[in-house]
Amino acid sequence: VPQYRFDTPNNLKELDESMTSKDETPTNEATQVDEQDLKQGPLHGLRILDLSSVVSGPMAAVVLADQGADVIKVEPPGWGDGIRGLGASRNGLSAIYAMINRNKRSIAINLKHPEGQELVRQLVQDADVLLQNYRPGKLQKLGLDYATLKAINPQLVYASINGMGEVGPYAEHKTYDYVIQALSGVLDVQAGGANAAEGQPLQMVRTILYDKITALTAAQGITAALLARARGAGGQHVQLSMLDTAVYFNWPDLMWNYSFKGQGAQLAGDLADVCEVSETSDGAIVSSYLGVDTRQYETEQLVDLLIENEIPVGRVNRREDLLSDPQIQATGILQAVDHPRGG
């Protein structure tokens, strides 16, 4: 999905001082790292300017931050990123904002003001990556587009995320995840697709699926661009849209009946048609199609029976069940930490 174009803190004073101490070793040359650097993550020593907001951009940036990059989140003065006020919160800190902006530093800059624009251009001089998810053309009007910033820092990897793409009849449309769900065909899939009963209502996916998939795709595209730069490709522009990412993600299975052009293809149902949700006396499980009434079994009893017969199965967890699931606890994927504001 990413199309590559190859070309040959809270206190500004503290931020400036920290930037002057940055290792001046060129980042486009292979360098030997010590054991301490490795412990700090594979992207330690790289600086990311995160000009993005809401989910797709910030979540891409937090992946880079978790891998050791120094991410500086740039927000408008006052309210900041609008997602600060979305969803569950404590002490004025929303959970989703905390989750996708951890491990970052923050600075407030008014990008509409000439002095704010100049400040970003100064920050770009020592940056490795700039990430933004404004609508196409918006940053060009502010003098912060790729062509302008490339002249300041030819080694810059500039990543642009947008909703619909740079061109086309929808390019200027304001876009959120639910819009991409509508266009991508996934509502038809959720309703049962070709096998749906007449009049079956269309169904949304009850998570911001394509925001998050776009974020992960962007993070991968950025690291690929950094690898290309280390091999001598120089700075480049990584571009992807949520719609392109959704089509790419959906295509292997949800669109397999549309992959062969012309006649002669043998069509098939969806992968979801081979599995089912089976109710139990105290919950439910998901497995391959059983075709029998399982309500006389307790969940764990039925799970054990199917596992014994080498049938893939999972009990249906409620969201609150996930926290105590023994497999989740065993892997340690969830960690409890103290937050100075959220607790």
Region roles according to the model:
Residues 1-78, 133, 150-159, 246-343:
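Acyl-CoA thioester-binding alpha/beta core of soluble enzymes
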Residues 53, 111, 135-136, 162-163, ...:
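Short glycine-/small-residue-rich Rossmann-like dinucleotide-binding loops
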Residues 88-92, 174-179, 256-257, 330-334:
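Short, hinge-like loop/turn segments at secondary-structure boundaries
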